[in-house]
């Protein structure tokens, strides 16, 4: 991808594409690292079924 603007209007589309990709990656990371642990925390009812690391608890996978 050439970002020097030599392709005329194409560089604008490339910039928008890069921004869109970054936003999607951030949304996925937010989902996995914030939303998923919160959902698992709710399901974790019994202490023996839970595993806690760094203050975030979730159901044991095994």
Curated annotation (Swiss-Prot):
It is found in: Virion membrane. GO terms for cellular component: membrane; viral envelope; virion membrane. Not glycosylated. It is a single-pass membrane protein. Keywords: Disulfide bond, Late protein, Membrane, Transmembrane, Transmembrane helix, Viral envelope protein, Virion. Signal peptide: none annotated. Induction: Expressed in the late phase of the viral replicative cycle. The keyword Membrane applies. Its main location: virion. The chain crosses the membrane at residues 16-36. It comes from the Viruses. Belongs to the asfivirus inner membrane protein p12 family. Homomultimer; disulfide-linked. This is Inner membrane protein p12. It comes from African swine fever virus (isolate Pig/Kenya/KEN-50/1950).
């Amino acid at each position: 991808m050439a970002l020097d603007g030599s392709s005329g209007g194409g560089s604008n589309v490339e910039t928008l594409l890069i921004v869109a990709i970054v936003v999607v990656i951030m949304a996925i990371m937010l989902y996995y690292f914030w939303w998923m642990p919160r959902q698992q925390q709710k399901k974790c009812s019994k202490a023996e079924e839970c595993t806690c690391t760094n203050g975030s608890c979730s159901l044991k996978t095994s």
